[in-house]
Amino acid sequence: MNKINYISFFLLITLGNLNAQNLAVLQYEGGGDWYSNPTALKNLIQFCNAEINTKMNLEPQRVSADDPEIFEYPMLHMTGHGNVFFNKETLQNLRTYLLGGGFLHIDDNYGMKPFILPQIKNLFPNIELTEVPLNHPIYNIH
């Protein structure tokens, strides 16, 4: 079993056995509508609870990208259209969150990609982004 499979297995077992977890929608600056698609995360939570037996609370919270409260959530959901901006403090907060094991799920409703990619590059300037192929094990949970 490779490292990704071990990590995925550990996460599935751990998340499945924890008490209910809160997830949050990430509020960000820049004028993009971070609040769009309000049912997306709720639908994802319902799917995960039903299909992989997680115990996530059905009502997601909302947290600002610069707020230390992001560390209270194992996963942040980011969505919207258009501009995204992270200032220096926000970048540091998100970087610390991600390096500490937090997960950021970015749902590009449409039109977000040209704005979010430079911000991701600012988060991790020394790391080259690569696309995960569709046949990667992470896409197969059953």
What are these regions (language model features)?
Residues 4-15:
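Sec-dependent N-terminal signal peptides
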Residues 19-75, 79-82:
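Aromatic-Pro/Gly-enriched surface loop or interdomain linker
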Residues 21-22, 27-31, 39-40, 113-142:
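An acidic, glycine-rich "communication" segment
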Residues 23, 75-114:
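Short alpha-beta junction capping motif
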Residues 39-43, 47, 89, 93, ...:
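Extracytoplasmic/secreted proteins, especially bacterial periplasmic and envelope-associated proteins
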Residues 47-55, 79, 96-100, 119-126:
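Structured segments of extracytoplasmic/periplasmic soluble domains
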Residues 55-63, 106-109, 127-134:
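Surface-exposed patches in mature extracellular/periplasmic domains of secreted proteins
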Residues 66-67, 87, 136:
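Polar helix-capping/helix-linker motif
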